[in-house]
Amino acid sequence: MACPQLPPLLLLVLVVLLKAGVNYNTPFTDIVTSENSMETSPVSSLISSPFAHSTHSSGEPPKSYSSTMSLETDSITHLSPSSSGATPTIQPSPSSTDSRMIPSSPQPETITHPSSGSPSAELTPSSHSTLPSSESLTPHWSPTSHSPGTEPLTSTDQTLEPPGPAPGDTGPRELHRNPSVVVVVCLLVSLLLIGSVVMAVRFCHRNESKFENLDEVSMGSVNDRLSFAHHLQE
């Protein structure tokens, strides 16, 4: 009795195990699909953002990648059905991988590089163009500041200016006054000398006797004086 009952029990155990395996596989497939959807959403945002930026910068119309994204999600969620309870296998299609690899790396690089390099290319000629303008201005100013035409003007101005004395210097004025002072002093000295000579001559003539002048006196005047002297004596 026990021997013929063993196969049905084994069959029941196998059925239970198969059901448990199917129940175990279903949450695994749900987890895989949720993870794939989470992975595809940032990938789609990253792919759409550089292309949107490139379309704004270059002026080209935006391209839709909904078909490639749908192929990716379909290839990720595609599971091989198995009745024996084996683990599900993910079979991505080659078209989805090709479509994933083509727009991901080369296109953003080719689009972002000109957009980032364009301001530098526009700025560099402007900076180079401003430098020659400043350099071209400097030689125009340098000859005018050191031109030889201005030097004779300064020399003529210096020659036209009178050599007037400084406000604190009194040397030239004294030189102009000294000749007049010398002349006045010489005149005073000469007058004093002449006066002294005249006074000396007069003083010398006072000591002379009056008898030397008798020859010049008339005899009649002498007789009159003598008669008058006789009358006085009597």
Swiss-Prot record:
Signal peptide extent: 1-24
UniProt keyword Ribonucleoprotein present: no
Membrane topology: Single-pass type I membrane protein
Protein's name according to its UniProt entry: Protein CIST1
Keywords of this entry: Membrane, Signal, Transmembrane, Transmembrane helix
Record topological domains on the Extracellular side: 25-180
Transmembrane segments annotated in the record for this chain: 181-201
